[in-house]
Each structure stands twice: as C-alpha cells, then as structure tokens.
Design a protein with these regions (language model features):
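TPR/TPR-like (Sel1-like) alpha-helical repeat modules
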Residues: 61-81
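Amphipathic alpha-helical interface segments used for dimerization/assembly
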Residues: 32, 51-55, 70
Length: 102
C-alpha cells in the first residue's frame, strides 16, 4: 500500500505533531509489519519509527540512546535516497527530518 493513502499513517503523523511519540511508534509498527520486505515503504516506515523513538528518548533525557537511534534513522534515510532518489517517500522523510531530527 502507498503509505500516504493509509488513514493509520496520517494518524501516526498527527501523533508525532502533538508529541505523542510512543503512540506514533505503535501505529507505525503495525503498518511496518504489513509492508513488503525490503520495500521503500518498509524503509520509510522504519525510518519514521526511529524518528519517533529518538524523540521519545530525547524527552526521557537518554542522550546516548537518542544519538544511536538517530544514527539508524539517518542510515535509513540515506538508503531511501540511494534507492529512490526522486520519490515522494524521500521528500516526505526529508520534511520530517527538518521538523523532528535531533
């Protein structure tokens, strides 16, 4: 499925905008489990999950965990950029990184 068409995906992004990172993570994990192995949708969802988790760890003042998780998010973003350089997925990830990267 195309992520942007899923109401659950929009719910997760709404949670993110309002600082409900755990809830966002839970919704995205359910989506992630239903994406095709090694697909751009799977990488994109996993990347956003890492952003949510990093923001949660940041709120919890767990600096080392935040840095480690952001490193993983950055690696996934780079992989999306390599595999789908002109994609909507990459554009959306870049927008989220501008708002939520730590």
């Amino acid at each position: 499925p195309i992520l942007q068409t899923l109401s659950a995906f929009h719910t997760a992004l709404n949670f993110m905008q309002h600082g409900f990172h755990w809830e966002e993570h839970e919704v995205l994990e359910a989506i992630w489990m239903n994406t095709a192995q090694n697909s751009i949708e799977r990488l994109c969802t996993q990347c956003i999950i890492h952003l949510a988790n990093a923001n949660l760890k940041h709120i919890m003042k767990r600096k080392t965990a935040t840095q480690k998780i952001m490193k993983n998010a950055n690696a996934l973003s780079a992989e999306i950029g390599r595999r789908a350089p002109n994609s909507v997925a990459l554009t959306e990830i870049q927008k989220l990184f501008l708002k939520y990267a730590l």
